[in-house]
Swiss-Prot record:
Quaternary assembly: Strongly interacts with the proteasome-associated ATPase ARC through a hydrophobic interface; the interacting region of Pup lies in its C-terminal half. There is one Pup binding site per ARC hexamer ring.
Organism of this sequence: Mycobacterium marinum (strain ATCC BAA-535 / M)
Pfam families recorded: Pup (PF05639)
GO terms of molecular function: proteasome binding; protein tag activity
Name of the featured protein: Prokaryotic ubiquitin-like protein Pup
Gene that encodes it: pup
Upper taxonomic lineage: Bacteria, Bacillati, Actinomycetota, Actinomycetes, Mycobacteriales
Family: Belongs to the prokaryotic ubiquitin-like protein family.
Length: 64
């Protein structure tokens, strides 16, 4: 079977659009990184307070 290949060129356009998109993407990455750090801190707090119950909740029953 023959496969068709298509090439797409960059649309050209304004560099300001790219800069705005890049800045928005950077903001989003920073926000997600902060949210991830907050979640990991919360998990650490739970583990410090009650690690045994946390582990027990994830142990599979029946020797599996």
């Amino acid at each position: 079977m023959a496969q068709e290949q298509t090439k797409r060129g960059g649309g050209g356009g304004d560099d300001e659009d790219v800069t705005g998109t890049t800045a928005a993407g950077q903001e989003r990455r920073e926000k997600l990184a902060q949210d991830t750090d907050d979640l990991l801190d919360e998990i650490d707090d739970v583990l410090e307070e009650n690690a045994e119950d946390f582990v027990r909740a994830y142990v599979q029953k029946g020797g599996q």
